[in-house]
Design a protein with these regions (language model features):
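A general "terminal functional-core" signal
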Residues: 1-133
């Protein structure tokens, strides 16, 4: 499911999307397996991005989707690497996903977004209405 977020959307917005859109969608749809297309180009420090995720944000999101898979489809989940144009961000993000998937290790990178995140509440509510949540 794609959710159109404005430039600068980061950890707060993505976590709200996970909680307020992805969770109800999965609970309603009842998938047999979850596929996640992971693009690390949404990292705030990616050279071509206008989004604002941090590595900690990727870890939080990955943990949430792993939990959804455990709750709704016997833990069946596949992560597929898509994009990311800064090698350090890709490595740190992939490590975060691995930690979330295996439950082993701790993320070392601490790279909070230094920019102010826009309020995305109205966009999230709009998408919820589109999907009847």
């Amino acid at each position: 499911m794609n959710v159109p977020l404005p430039a600068g959307a980061g950890d707060v917005a993505y976590e709200k999307v996970a909680d307020e859109i992805s969770r109800p969608f999965v609970e309603n749809y009842k998938p047999q397996m979850i596929f996640v297309s992971v693009g690390f180009d949404a990292h705030w420090n990616d050279p071509i991005t206008t989004l604002g995720l941090s590595t900690a944000g990727y870890l939080t999101l990955a943990r949430k989707v792993v939990q959804l898979a455990e709750e709704h489809c016997e833990g069946k989940i596949v992560f597929v690497l898509e994009g990311g144009y800064d090698p350090r961000n890709v490595a740190n993000g992939a490590e975060a996903v691995f930690i979330a998937e295996t439950g082993k290790g701790e993320a070392e990178a601490s790279d909070p977004n230094p920019r102010k995140e826009p309020d995305c509440a109205s966009r999230i509510q709009e998408v919820r209405r589109w999907h009847g949540f």
